[in-house]
């Protein structure tokens, strides 16, 4: 029997609990400073201790994973801490499509894929001098909202950028992405595409809680006006969101279009979990500003199954367990090569 492995962060507990529930041996690549915490959980069979996650690429760590016949599950920490070249160089099988993680990290590739999928998107702003409306400025890759800021003009953009550089949050040469800010109800739509069944599943939706931008809503406007600080969008946690049933058909359609576009642009396509992120406007239409081409941390709120998976399965299934079940089925059907890269 193969083993399942991942990095000790993000959603690793959900992933390895799901793998253990499906009968797999589990390995966690764990930073030494967090060893005591992860040893609390009996479903983790082995800790592969490292000083930093960059050691995942080293011969020693790769050998341990290979000796355990392991399949590595990528998540946001992998995308945040490693370059696309590094991810693509991983020697053990990676669940899903490791090549599409480059498209998640690169803003121009990300926009190209979203346009190909016919997703409704906010306007991107080419340069600070073109800012003519409220914008949100983002970093490349999976930064978890850290270093994001809003601006109404080039002057405000430059002032806030300089402040973040001086505080060490962003670097001087960091390539920032400027996007029109679209108001609405934030929704992070979670999907799973099974290449074995050639079918898409809507897993659920969540909202993210960000500090300290959320706390500002509890401060009276006159006090806010007197503040010179830059609010942060650092993600602290997630909460569940159940969509109106009339919106579900559109959510499925977006997921299907995204999978089809992915198969055309970055073979073998969008296999496994992914998330389309955006806002619902007052007309009920969804505007997408991001996608994540792997499991997202928002699935952690459904560790005992989501409301929508309750409609598809007769037992509680987390996204971590759904991934493990796909691997298990692929092994049984001798189709593992269709689920890993």
UniProtKB/Swiss-Prot annotation:
<feature type="binding site">
    <location>
        <position position="290"/>
    </location>
    <ligand>
        <name>Mg(2+)</name>
    </ligand>
</feature>
<comment type="function">
    <text>Catalyzes the ATP- and formate-dependent formylation of 5-aminoimidazole-4-carboxamide-1-beta-d-ribofuranosyl 5'-monophosphate (AICAR) to 5-formaminoimidazole-4-carboxamide-1-beta-d-ribofuranosyl 5'-monophosphate (FAICAR) in the absence of folates.</text>
</comment>
<dbReference type="InterPro" id="IPR013815">
    <property type="entry name" value="ATP_grasp_subdomain_1"/>
</dbReference>
<dbReference type="InterPro" id="IPR009720">
    <property type="entry name" value="IMP_biosynth_PurP_C"/>
</dbReference>
<comment type="pathway">
    <text>Purine metabolism; IMP biosynthesis via de novo pathway; 5-formamido-1-(5-phospho-D-ribosyl)imidazole-4-carboxamide from 5-amino-1-(5-phospho-D-ribosyl)imidazole-4-carboxamide (formate route): step 1/1.</text>
</comment>
<dbReference type="InterPro" id="IPR023656">
    <property type="entry name" value="IMP_biosynth_PurP"/>
</dbReference>
<feature type="binding site">
    <location>
        <begin position="132"/>
        <end position="188"/>
    </location>
    <ligand>
        <name>ATP</name>
    </ligand>
</feature>
<dbReference type="GO" id="GO:0006189">
    <property type="term" value="P:'de novo' IMP biosynthetic process"/>
</dbReference>
<dbReference type="InterPro" id="IPR016185">
    <property type="entry name" value="PreATP-grasp_dom_sf"/>
</dbReference>
<keyword id="KW-0067">ATP-binding</keyword>
<keyword id="KW-0547">Nucleotide-binding</keyword>
<dbReference type="GO" id="GO:0005524">
    <property type="term" value="F:ATP binding"/>
</dbReference>
<feature type="binding site">
    <location>
        <position position="238"/>
    </location>
    <ligand>
        <name>5-amino-1-(5-phospho-beta-D-ribosyl)imidazole-4-carboxamide</name>
    </ligand>
</feature>
<keyword id="KW-0436">Ligase</keyword>
<protein>
    <recommendedName>
        <fullName>5-formaminoimidazole-4-carboxamide-1-(beta)-D-ribofuranosyl 5'-monophosphate synthetase</fullName>
        <ecNumber>6.3.4.23</ecNumber>
    </recommendedName>
</protein>
<keyword id="KW-0460">Magnesium</keyword>
<dbReference type="Pfam" id="PF06973">
    <property type="entry name" value="DUF1297"/>
</dbReference>
<keyword id="KW-0464">Manganese</keyword>
<dbReference type="InterPro" id="IPR011761">
    <property type="entry name" value="ATP-grasp"/>
</dbReference>
<dbReference type="GO" id="GO:0016879">
    <property type="term" value="F:ligase activity, forming carbon-nitrogen bonds"/>
</dbReference>
<feature type="domain" description="ATP-grasp">
    <location>
        <begin position="106"/>
        <end position="317"/>
    </location>
</feature>
<comment type="similarity">
    <text>Belongs to the phosphohexose mutase family.</text>
</comment>
<feature type="binding site">
    <location>
        <position position="277"/>
    </location>
    <ligand>
        <name>Mg(2+)</name>
    </ligand>
</feature>
<keyword id="KW-0658">Purine biosynthesis</keyword>
<keyword id="KW-0479">Metal-binding</keyword>
<dbReference type="InterPro" id="IPR010672">
    <property type="entry name" value="IMP_biosynth_PurP_N"/>
</dbReference>
<dbReference type="Pfam" id="PF06849">
    <property type="entry name" value="DUF1246"/>
</dbReference>
<feature type="binding site">
    <location>
        <position position="10"/>
    </location>
    <ligand>
        <name>5-amino-1-(5-phospho-beta-D-ribosyl)imidazole-4-carboxamide</name>
    </ligand>
</feature>
<dbReference type="GO" id="GO:0000287">
    <property type="term" value="F:magnesium ion binding"/>
</dbReference>
<feature type="binding site">
    <location>
        <position position="77"/>
    </location>
    <ligand>
        <name>5-amino-1-(5-phospho-beta-D-ribosyl)imidazole-4-carboxamide</name>
    </ligand>
</feature>
<feature type="binding site">
    <location>
        <position position="210"/>
    </location>
    <ligand>
        <name>ATP</name>
    </ligand>
</feature>
């Amino acid at each position: 029997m193969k083993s399942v492995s991942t990095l000790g962060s993000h959603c690793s507990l959900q992933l390895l609990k799901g793998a253990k529930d499906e009968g797999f041996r589990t390995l966690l690549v764990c930073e030494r400073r967090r060893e005591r915490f992860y040893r609390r959980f009996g479903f983790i069979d082995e800790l592969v201790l490292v000083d930093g996650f960059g050691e995942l690429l080293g011969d020693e760590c790769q050998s341990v994973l290979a000796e355990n016949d392991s399949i590595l599950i990528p998540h946001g920490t992998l995308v945040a801490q490693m370059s696309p070249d590094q991810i693509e160089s991983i020697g053990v099988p990676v669940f899903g499509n490791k090549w599409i993680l480059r498209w998640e990290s690169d803003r121009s590739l990300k926009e190209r894929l979203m346009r190909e999928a016919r997703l409704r998107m906010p306007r991107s702003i080419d340069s600070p001098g073109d800012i003519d409306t409220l914008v949100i400025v983002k970093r490349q890759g999976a930064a978890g909202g850290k270093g994001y800021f809003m601006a109404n003009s080039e002057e405000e953009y430059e002032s806030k950028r300089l402040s973040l550089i001086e505080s060490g949050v962003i670097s001087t040469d960091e390539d920032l992405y400027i996007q029109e800010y679209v108001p609405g109800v934030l929704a992070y739509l979670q999907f799973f595409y099974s290449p074995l069944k050639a079918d898409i599943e809507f897993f659920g939706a969540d909202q993210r809680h960000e500090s300290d931008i959320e706390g500002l809503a509890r401060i009276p406007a006159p006090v806010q006006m007197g503040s010179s600080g830059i609010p942060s969008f650092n993600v602290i946690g997630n909460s569940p969101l159940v969509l109106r049933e009339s919106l579900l058909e559109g959510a499925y359609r977006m997921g299907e279009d995204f999978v089809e576009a992915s198969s055309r642009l970055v073979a073998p396509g969008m296999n496994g979990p992914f998330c389309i992120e955006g806002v619902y406007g007052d007309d009920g239409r969804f505007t997408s500003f991001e996608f994540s081409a792997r499991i997202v941390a928002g699935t952690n709120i459904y560790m005992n199954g989501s409301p929508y998976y309750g409609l598809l399965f007769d037992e509680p299934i987390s996204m971590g367990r759904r991934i493990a079940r796909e691997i298990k089925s692929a092994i049984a059907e001798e189709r593992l090569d269709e689920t890993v890269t």
